[in-house]
Amino acid sequence: YYFRICFLDNFQAQVLVNFAKEKFSAQKAYCLGELGNEYDQGLIAFFEQNFDGEVIKDSFPTNTSDFTTYLNKAVAEDVDVIFCPVSIAYATQIVGLAASMGLDIPLLGSDTLDSNVVLEAAQGSNVQLYVSTFYQEGGSPEFDDGIKAWLNEDSTAMTNNGGNDTIAAVTAMGYDAYYVALEALKAAGSTDKAAVKAALPDVTYTGVSGSIAFDEQGDAIRDT
């Protein structure tokens, strides 16, 4: 069993499709993911299901280090947007290459691209990078101030955060997950695993990332 506080991938894909249509009037999309990666391919499938225009898809082998062919294909196909829900390592390479190429096609990414390392790769360039996120800095000023103070006092934490004190969404989610677990422990009145599992479905919590509850499968019910 599991209990997770994040938005589901199908919801992320739907939001990104809606964004592509509303902001760019997108009718043609290029989707790129790692071959055999369930996360990448699942999000691409959800994106395609919700996108009512033309979708061109490619998959790259694991350990690919040159994405020139793929980005050149997107340009040649004259697509309106590129959707690449890939890992941080691949995303950093793709964004860096897009910057060096002067690519003017908007890049859309899932929550994995909401990383300071990836965002830094786009700094100083004209790359249009848009990502789905669980938390935007400014959502909870008190939380932001506390995390920034900690980052600036701990050089290792700062390095792990991408070398700056921008609040990463995963930080907010980890913070909320901790307190959701704490609420379950309080409700159970015990640290017994079975008791905590039984208490979790009824936990509701308002965290820095919004209101959190669970459905019968352990997936998050979010109103934000």
Predicted regions and their residues:
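An alpha-beta-alpha
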Residues: Y2-T62, V81
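Structural motif
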Residues: Q12-V15, S59-A76, P141-F143
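Second-shell loop/turn segments in exported
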Residues: Y1-F7, G33-G36, Y130-E137, G163-A169, ...
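Extracellular/periplasmic periplasmic-binding protein-like sensory domains
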Residues: G53, V95-Y175
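Segments of small-molecule ligand-sensing domains
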Residues: S155-A172, L182-T224
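Solvent-exposed loop/turn segments at secondary-structure junctions
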Residues: F7-F11, L35-Y39, F60-S65, S87-T92, ...
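Periplasmic-binding protein-like
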Residues: K28-G33, D78-I88, I94, I105-S110, ...
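Sec-exported extracytoplasmic/periplasmic mature domains
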Residues: N18-S25, E48-D52, N72-V79, G96-L103, ...
